[in-house]
């Protein structure tokens, strides 16, 4: 038994000696080899490996940087209006326009995006009416149609009534009217699709309306080109009836034939009946503010696009702003017609303002209009209000250039900008 224990102890001792030799009791040469394998390299070897690791890290960093640049370049939208991207006072920067803006989703998503972008720049949204998706007028002069319909849509949406109207239906009827006048005047009447906000109300009352889903196309129609083709086709016909049919064919080829009836909530309407159900003849009124006409009267404003000779009720500037605010407080959107050719109108950044050095008074406003510094360029729909931490008041306006800017198709108009550059307002009756 003792011999067996001695033998076991001897075996254990020899095993420890072997392990000791294997794990640390090596000769200096062997230890040097293992040390080299585990990091104790000579300076030259360390330098080579460090350089290799540095080159790998540099390559990885460059690849990551290149991928970020490519992704940012592909996702950046193209703005309709050229801007320098500078930051306006209390405004938004053009960097926000790199956000994904191709799909609106639900109304709540639009509101959340607007409020989030504004919040990042110290602007608080205080009022935002429900809106239908932002549309794109494309290569057409139909901002007045889009803005008027958007005001009607948002006002109905605020009252809990969902309605989305077709701009192409009004554009078709405008085309037919202009082509008739052009043919009957033997080309002396200008074939123009430009207009003002009250002209859209005229078309609704006289020709009716169509739901957007019943009469629209997936992409914007070039109504300028369509009108040119219509004139050429009509001029080739010897009689008025045949000329009208030729123009109607051009419109059919562009957007399709007009449905004879409107089906809504299980009921059948004519286009005129449907228009009366969404826009009464006395529901909207036009206002302006210029001193070359007396206040308190309906005036025929001298605008090149006022083709129907519509009148606007002339009021003092403070009254005009009061009407705008009261309409928004009553959950009614407002059609806006005015000047966007100013340097302070930054579409990509989503903000419009005038320099602080400009006195936004009735007199200065009139002076700029008289000198043609304020022109009738564009129409928008005012659907909300906001205020910056510096106290600057803004109006939130919906555009018709698609969701191509920082606010996904909306823009903040400062109160100073509205006071100086508004030509007319389309305000709902109380």
Roles of regions detected by a PLM:
Residues 11-55:
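Long, intrinsically disordered low-complexity tandem-repeat segments
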Residues 60-69:
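Bacterial N-terminal signal peptides
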Residues 71-73:
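C-terminal motif of bacterial Sec signal peptides marking the signal peptidase cleavage site
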Residues 75-82:
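Bacterial lipoprotein signal-peptidase II cleavage site
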Residues 77, 248-430:
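Active-site signature of cysteine proteases
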Residues 96-129:
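N-terminal regions that are enriched for targeting/export leaders
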Residues 129-141, 184-192, 307-314, 323-324, ...:
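Second-shell loop/turn segments in exported
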Residues 164-264:
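Papain-like cysteine protease catalytic cores
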């Amino acid at each position: 038994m003792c011999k067996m224990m001695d033998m076991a102890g001897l075996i254990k001792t020899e095993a420890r000696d072997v392990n000791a030799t294997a794990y640390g009791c090596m000769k200096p040469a062997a230890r040097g080899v293992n040390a080299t394998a585990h990091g104790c390299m000579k300076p030259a070897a360390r330098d080579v490996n460090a350089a290799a690791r540095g080159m790998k890290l540099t390559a990885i960093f460059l690849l990551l940087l290149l991928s970020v640049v490519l992704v940012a370049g592909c996702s950046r939208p193209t703005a309709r209006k050229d801007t320098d991207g500078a930051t306006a006072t209390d405004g938004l920067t053009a960097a926000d326009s790199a956000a994904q803006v191709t799909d609106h989703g639900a109304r709540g998503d639009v509101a959340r995006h607007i409020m989030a972008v504004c919040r990042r720049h110290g602007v608080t949204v205080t009022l935002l009416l429900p809106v239908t998706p932002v549309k794109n007028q494309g290569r057409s002069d139909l901002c007045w149609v889009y803005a008027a319909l958007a005001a009607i849509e948002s006002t109905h949406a605020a009252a809990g009534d969902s309605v989305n109207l077709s701009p192409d239906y009004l554009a078709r009827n405008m085309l037919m009217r202009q082509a008739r006048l052009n043919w009957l005047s033997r080309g002396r009447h200008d074939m123009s699709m430009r207009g003002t906000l009250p002209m859209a109300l005229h078309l609704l009352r006289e020709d009716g309306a169509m739901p957007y889903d019943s009469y629209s196309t997936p992409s914007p129609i070039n109504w300028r080109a369509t009108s040119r083709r219509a004139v050429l086709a009509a001029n080739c016909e010897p009689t008025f009836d045949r000329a009208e049919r030729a123009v109607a064919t051009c419109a059919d080829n562009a957007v399709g034939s007009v449905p004879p009836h409107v089906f809504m909530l299980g009921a059948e309407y004519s286009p005129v009946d449907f228009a009366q159900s969404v826009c009464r003849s006395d529901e909207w009124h036009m206002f302006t503010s210029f001193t070359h006409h007396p206040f308190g009267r309906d005036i025929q404003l001298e605008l090149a696009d006022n083709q129907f000779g519509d009148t606007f009720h002339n009021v003092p500037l403070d009254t005009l702003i009061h009407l705008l605010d009261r309409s928004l407080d009553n959950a009614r959107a407002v059609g806006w017609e005015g000047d966007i050719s100013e340097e302070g109108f930054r579409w990509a950044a989503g903000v419009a303002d005038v320099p602080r050095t400009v006195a936004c008074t009735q007199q200065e406003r009139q002076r700029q209009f008289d000198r043609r510094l304020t022109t009738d360029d564009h129409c928008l729909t005012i659907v909300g209000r906001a205020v910056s931490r510096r106290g600057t008041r803004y109006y939130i306006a919906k555009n018709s250039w698609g969701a191509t800017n920082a606010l996904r198709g909306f823009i903040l108009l400062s109160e100073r900008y509205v006071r100086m550059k508004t030509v007319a307002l389309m305000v709902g009756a109380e």
